[in-house]
């Protein structure tokens, strides 16, 4: 059913693409719209893990993700190598355009189903990124780490900070799919959420 939802979404686009075209590069917005709509059955499929491995590939050494990536695409060798190289470009990690929060949730749902440690590790690294990126005053910059520019300003636009705080609340309340997280992470998430409220 989850895979059917993905195919149906693509098929109803104005371009009337073939069902298999969802594995080709699409506008990044397709990913952030589709990812939250997958049902639990989808995460039992090999396709879910293929996409999950792409998500891990694009995760940067900061623990965060760059924005505007269509994760379901089947990558060419050149795209794969470019993604590997970009892992160390720490200036691209962001919470803008639903980046990082979308990937954390996807990997958490995938881990719940597969129990594969690599997906759990991806989730934990992503959460640590959010915690490290928070300013002392409780806000989050659009990009972290970046030394200067508008990227380092607290990001209220596009609901970026709100999405982060909603995710942190789900984490410390241990709501699905975050039921597996250790208590120390939940405590850190609660503290970060409370700081965000005060910002």
Residue ranges and their predicted role:
Residues 1-18:
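Bacterial Sec-dependent N-terminal signal peptides
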Residues 18-26, 59-88, 132-152, 199:
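Glycine- and aromatic-rich loop/turn segments at beta-sheet edges
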Residues 51-63, 122-139, 188-199:
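Long, well-ordered core segments of solenoidal/helical folds
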């Amino acid at each position: 059913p989850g895979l059917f939802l993905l195919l149906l979404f693509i098929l109803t686009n104005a371009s009337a693409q073939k069902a298999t075209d969802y594995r080709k590069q699409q506008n990044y917005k397709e990913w952030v719209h589709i990812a939250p709509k997958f049902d639990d059955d989808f995460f039992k499929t090999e396709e879910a893990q293929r996409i999950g491995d792409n998500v891990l590939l694009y995760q940067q050494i900061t623990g965060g993700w760059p924005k505007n990536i269509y994760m379901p695409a089947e990558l060419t060798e050149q795209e794969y190598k470019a993604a590997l190289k970009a892992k160390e470009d720490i200036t691209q990690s962001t919470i803008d355009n639903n980046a990082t929060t979308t990937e954390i949730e996807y990997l958490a749902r995938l881990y719940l189903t597969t129990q594969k440690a690599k997906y759990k590790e991806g989730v934990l690294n992503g959460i640590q990124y959010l915690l490290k990126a928070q300013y002392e005053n409780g806000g989050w910059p659009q990009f972290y780490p970046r030394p200067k520019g508008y990227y380092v300003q607290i990001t209220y636009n596009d609901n970026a900070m709100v999405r982060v705080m909603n995710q942190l609340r789900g984490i410390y309340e241990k709501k699905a799919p975050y039921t597996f997280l250790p208590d120390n992470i939940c405590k850190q998430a609660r503290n970060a959420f409370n700081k965000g409220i005060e910002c």
